[in-house]
Structures are given as C-alpha cells and as structure tokens.
Amino acid sequence: MKNKKILLLILGFLVILFLTIFAYFRIYQTLPKFAVSLIPEAEIPGQGKTVLVIVPHEDDEVLGAGGFIEKSIKNGANVMVIFLTNGDGHKFTTQEESRKLYPKPENYIESGYQRQQEAKKALAILGLPENKIIFMGYPDNGLKNLFEENFSEPYLSPYTKQNYCSYSNCYHKEAPYTGENLQNDLEQIIKTYSPDLILTTHPSDTHSDHSYCADFVANAIETNPTQPELYYFIIHFNRFPYPKGLHINRYLTPPGRLISSSDEWLKTSLDSDTLELKKQALEQYQSQFASPMLKSLMEGFLRKNEIFSKAKKR
C-alpha cells in the first residue's frame, strides 16, 4: 500500500513536471534547433516577379527579411520596401539625438528623417536603390488608433503634434492621419505594383504597430484584383528571438505559441556572405543601437536563417 502511494506521488510529480515544461514551451520558448531541418525552404522570387516588403518602422525590413530581400534582388526580382511610419515616436532615441530630456515635436520629426536616411543606407547595402523605397509617413505608435478609433477622424501624434503627414517626402503629401487614408494608399500601392508576394509583420506580434500593419495589409489585399501570396515575419514576441544577442551560428525557430498543425512555416537559409550583408545593413540603424536593450534584440536576428509564416487565404 505504501509503495503504491509512493508510485502515485512520483507519477503525479512527473505529470506536473511535463505539463509545466509544455506550458513553458508554449508560452515562452521557440522550437528546438533540430526543428529547423523540418521547415521547408521558401522559394526565392526571380526575374519577372515583384515583391513588396511592407513594414511599420525603419529596421523591421532588415530584421525580419534582410536576407530574403538581398537574395531576391540578386535573383532578379523587383523588390520594393514600404514603410508605414517614420519611426518618429521613440522617446529614448530622440532624447539621445537631440540631447534633450524632453524633446520637442520638431526633434521627433528630425528623428524621423534620421530613420529614413538609415533605411536608405541599409537597403543600399542589400542592393536596393532609393527609388525602390516608399515612406508613407503615418504616425509611429499610432496604427492601432488609425485602425480602430481614427479611421475617419484625424489622429494627433503625441510626439510630432501633427495630425497629417508633414514630411516632405510622404507618399501622400499632407495626408490627414486617418485609417481610411492609410488603407487607400496601401490599396493604391498594391494595385500599382501588382506584387506576386508581400512580406509584412505578423498579426500576433506583440507590438501594436506590427500587428495592425498586418491587418491593414490583409485588408488592402482583399480589394486587389489579383491575390498575391502573403508571408508574415515576427519581430516582437515572448522571449523571441531566443536567446537575445548576437549568435550568428544559431538558427531562428518559430515561437512555440505560434505553432499549430494548420500553420505553414518557411525558412530562408543565409550563407555567410548574405549574413554579413544583413549585419552591415542592420548596423546602419545606429539610432536604435544606442539602446542596449534594442541592440540585443536586433542582433538576435543575425542568425543562419529567417522564418516566415505563410498566410492562409481569407
């Protein structure tokens, strides 16, 4: 009888341990590195194919898809990169650049122009010329508001104190900050360039600009006569990428919570030359490297591969 109780206690402990490990994996961890070999390679677009990379901030394109961009350009594809915002709502970097504890609206706008210049330099390293870049200039940290509350009424940026795009190089000059304008502009861009493939941030990304960027893109695709393929990449998620920091000999694997039997994940393997170019491109974003926390996050994407989740057709 005593042995039976001990056995039951041991079994109970093992069950609890298993469930704890499983829950930890689902919430925080990524797949083990051997799982990378089970993820199929994404086809790299070539001659006659058009790829749009649509992201909320300058640096997201290199973090999530820098290698894919470089390989697609080298393979002959027509690649365009579209930035929804100028990343002008980052207080820490604006404080650093302006040397002011309380930056003024014009300091945030100057920061936005700085992010644009960094993006041009970064993408040039990957082989993308400046005329293949579109800056839409919508409000940083405001995409959720545009999608949910300010679809028709202009949104006032708490950083730049503007409710319209005041940048000289906006895609839609002086466009009021409304979700409707952003949606219409995206639809026009997609219609104009007729992409075969769109890459954008993941709808489950924990940064609201990233998740709502995915929503705006998905809605814009729905109105398009042709339906391009849509790949998502993740930037912000629980303990992703794991581990943080520079680990160029490690692989990037999907977060456990984003894995299900119906998901189709793809990878792009990066050789040493492509990885070096991605590293050089990322280093152009010195405004972001000023923050040790951001630097650690960004360097975590310098791995031997990139990963994408293929969107399901609506």
Predicted regions and their residues:
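Short Gly/Thr/Asp-enriched flexible loops that form oxyanion-binding sites at enzyme active sites
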Residues: D209-I221
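Short, flexible loop segments at boundaries between secondary-structure elements
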Residues: N224-H247
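A conserved mid-domain beta-alpha-beta active-site/ligand-binding segment of alpha/beta enzyme cores
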Residues: K244-Q288
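Proline-aspartate-enriched helix->loop->beta-strand connector
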Residues: L186-D205, H210
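Active-site environment of divalent metal-dependent phosphoester hydrolases
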Residues: D60-L63, G89-K91, P203-H210, F240
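N-terminal Sec-pathway targeting helices
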Residues: M1-I16
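C-terminal and late-domain segments of enzyme folds
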Residues: Q286-R314
